[in-house]
């Protein structure tokens, strides 16, 4: 999961500070999410999935299909 977060961020040409702002956390906190040293709250996972237009299942590694769910 953590590698997917980094890959998505890099694919969107973003730095950790930019993504941290989306989540309203510090860059240090986001860095810890991305490295796996801090568990990501479910609200942050949902926010990341919406931000990247993907599903939480994709972020968690439960699927390899990055497409979001239909609403």
PLM ranges: what are they?
Residues 1, 5, 55-56:
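Hydrophobic side chains within well-formed alpha-helices
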Residues 37-47, 68:
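Short, basic-rich loop-to-helix N-cap that marks the start of a DNA-contacting helix
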Residues 24-39:
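Recognition helix of helix-turn-helix/homeodomain-like DNA-binding domains
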Residues 34, 52, 60-63:
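DNA major-groove recognition helix of helix-turn-helix
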Residues 5, 19-20, 30-33, 59:
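Conserved hydrophobic/aromatic packing and binding residues within compact polymer-binding modules
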Residues 3-22, 47:
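Short basic helix-loop element that most often maps to the first helix and adjoining turn
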